[in-house]
């Protein structure tokens, strides 16, 4: 964290730009699982409702992809790569064994998933009736879903046990996602740049990355608009609230950029 001279707390904000649909989906799922962690640890019916909303979104995201096989393939690829580092004297044998153990555990967990991801939820007619009704804006009131209203009025401990039963089968998927994203984020080298008058451009083959991570201080009231391909990277910083799409935040802005690849 950074502190300004007038004692106003400033933070460093990280923006992540996935450069493939596969990584974009993993980041979305990671965000949904984080929301589930946050809300499921609390007691109110509103927070437990938020858990179900996130669970239903996970179902929708995973229904349009072959996530299980993609994760298995990536974990096997990373395991093979890491096994090849055993003869490297600069690599900690203990740390290597630890990550390989995590990869093997996640791999086995994914193999053990029966059928489609989230099948235990899809087979629950009551949950699916709640999900269907929730697809209508504002349609989760007690007169829309009286049985769901009853569940929301049970003791928090009872609701939390139900939530645990619904969340736990996703553990192998989440473990695989965490491993892949952690390895991806740790694969890059941080470089410091300055966007002159809010604009930055760079050409080169290093932009063949899977993920870009940009860090900027919150003292600058702007956000980055990033476009990247294998030929060039363009970053334009715009005011965080603006009525003009072409407006640029015209100051020199220091930022940190990381190109991450698997």
Swiss-Prot record:
<protein>
    <recommendedName>
        <fullName>Cell division protein ZapD</fullName>
    </recommendedName>
</protein>
<comment type="function">
    <text>Cell division factor that enhances FtsZ-ring assembly. Directly interacts with FtsZ and promotes bundling of FtsZ protofilaments, with a reduction in FtsZ GTPase activity.</text>
</comment>
<dbReference type="GO" id="GO:0005737">
    <property type="term" value="C:cytoplasm"/>
</dbReference>
<dbReference type="GO" id="GO:0000917">
    <property type="term" value="P:division septum assembly"/>
</dbReference>
<keyword id="KW-0132">Cell division</keyword>
<keyword id="KW-0717">Septation</keyword>
<dbReference type="InterPro" id="IPR009777">
    <property type="entry name" value="ZapD"/>
</dbReference>
<keyword id="KW-0963">Cytoplasm</keyword>
<dbReference type="InterPro" id="IPR036268">
    <property type="entry name" value="ZapD_sf"/>
</dbReference>
<comment type="subunit">
    <text>Interacts with FtsZ.</text>
</comment>
<dbReference type="GO" id="GO:0043093">
    <property type="term" value="P:FtsZ-dependent cytokinesis"/>
</dbReference>
<keyword id="KW-0131">Cell cycle</keyword>
<comment type="similarity">
    <text>Belongs to the ZapD family.</text>
</comment>
<dbReference type="Pfam" id="PF07072">
    <property type="entry name" value="ZapD"/>
</dbReference>
<dbReference type="GO" id="GO:0032153">
    <property type="term" value="C:cell division site"/>
</dbReference>
<dbReference type="InterPro" id="IPR027462">
    <property type="entry name" value="ZapD_C"/>
</dbReference>
């Amino acid at each position: 964290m950074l502190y300004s001279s007038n004692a106003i707390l400033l933070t460093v904000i990280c923006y992540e730009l996935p450069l493939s649909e596969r990584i974009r989906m993993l980041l979305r799922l990671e965000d949904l699982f984080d929301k589930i962690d946050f809300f499921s640890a609390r007691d109110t019916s509103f927070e437990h409702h938020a858990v179900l909303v996130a669970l239903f979104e996970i179902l929708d995201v995973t229904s349009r992809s072959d996530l299980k096989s993609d994760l298995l393939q990536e974990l096997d690829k990373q395991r093979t790569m890491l096994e090849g580092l055993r003869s490297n004297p600069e690599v900690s044998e203990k740390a290597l064994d630890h990550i390989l153990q995590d990869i093997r555990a996640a791999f086995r967990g994914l193999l053990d998933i029966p059928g489609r991801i989230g099948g235990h939820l899809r087979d629950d007619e009551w949950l699916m009736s709640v999900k269907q009704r929730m697809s209508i804006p504002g349609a989760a009131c007690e007169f829309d879903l009286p049985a769901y209203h009853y569940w929301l009025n049970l003791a928090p401990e009872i609701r939390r046990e139900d939530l645990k039963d619904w969340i736990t089968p996703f553990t192998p998927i989440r473990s695989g996602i965490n491993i892949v994203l952690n390895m991806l984020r740790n694969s890059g080298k941080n470089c410091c740049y300055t966007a002159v008058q809010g604009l930055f451009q760079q050409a080169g083959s290093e932009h063949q990355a899977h993920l870009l991570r940009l860090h900027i201080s919150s003292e600058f009231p702007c956000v980055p608009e990033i476009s990247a391909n294998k030929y060039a990277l363009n970053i334009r910083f715009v005011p965080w609230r603006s009525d003009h799409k072409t407006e640029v935040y015209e100051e020199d802005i220091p930022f940190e950029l990381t190109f991450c690849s698997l």
